[in-house]
């Protein structure tokens, strides 16, 4: 485990590990989580591409992808107080990161990182939200059905979060959403929640919605 709380392993090992999920007969899985995005933009895109490849091949799972850490956070010697970029810079960085990633209805892109307490290190750290978005889908499965949207005030609440590294305003949310990226926001009175339910599909289609893709998987 490195200083940011991520596994200290190479991209090659992670990609090889995800390759084990390609066999849908031997491995039963619904959600493919990117996990840490501590590498640079190109490394994180390579991991995202692998996850999408696995999901597309299986056709019974969805990949959850967050932007690379450096798009919004610059780590310092104090891991509890890294430098966070301006919202304007983060918006541009996140859109630029996701833009080259292939169009697919088997992936969900989110807007960033939450600040949470890590009980294992007894400290706070920024963690990518892909695990949380996958968790919202799992919770929706349990409490409702896969064809319900996991977003919004009713089902989109993100738990175990103190704050967000990036809380986009309306104009920034609109830019993100039109770029296939689901904003996660802080809403007064509602807390931190997922504010979009798009897949990574670039064309206007029923399959550009998470609940529709999951209905057909179900």
Task: Please provide the spans of the model-predicted regions.
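A glycine- and small-residue-enriched flexible loop/hinge signal that marks low-structured segments
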Residues: 1-218
């Amino acid at each position: 485990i490195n200083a940011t709380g991520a596994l200290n392993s190479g991209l090659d090992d992670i990609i090889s590990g995800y390759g084990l999920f390609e066999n849908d007969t031997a491995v039963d899985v619904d959600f493919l989580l990117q996990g840490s995005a501590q590498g640079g933009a190109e490394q994180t895109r390579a991991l995202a591409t692998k996850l999408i490849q696995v999901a597309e091949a299986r056709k019974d799972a969805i990949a959850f992808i967050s932007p690379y850490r450096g798009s919004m956070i610059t780590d310092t010697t104090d891991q509890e107080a890294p430098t966070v970029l301006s919202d304007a810079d983060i918006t541009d960085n996140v859109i630029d990161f996701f833009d080259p990633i292939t169009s697919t209805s088997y992936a969900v892109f989110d807007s960033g990182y939450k600040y949470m307490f890590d009980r294992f290190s007894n400290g706070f750290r920024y963690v990518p939200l892909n695990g949380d978005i996958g968790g919202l889908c799992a919770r929706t499965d349990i409490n409702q059905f896969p064809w319900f949207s996991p977003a919004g005030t009713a089902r989109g609440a993100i738990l175990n979060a103190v704050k967000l590294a990036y809380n986009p305003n309306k104009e920034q949310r609109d830019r993100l959403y039109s770029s296939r990226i689901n904003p996660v926001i802080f809403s007064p009175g509602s807390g931190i929640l997922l504010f979009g339910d798009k897949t990574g599909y670039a064309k206007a289609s029923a399959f550009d919605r998470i609940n529709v893709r999951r209905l057909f998987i179900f």
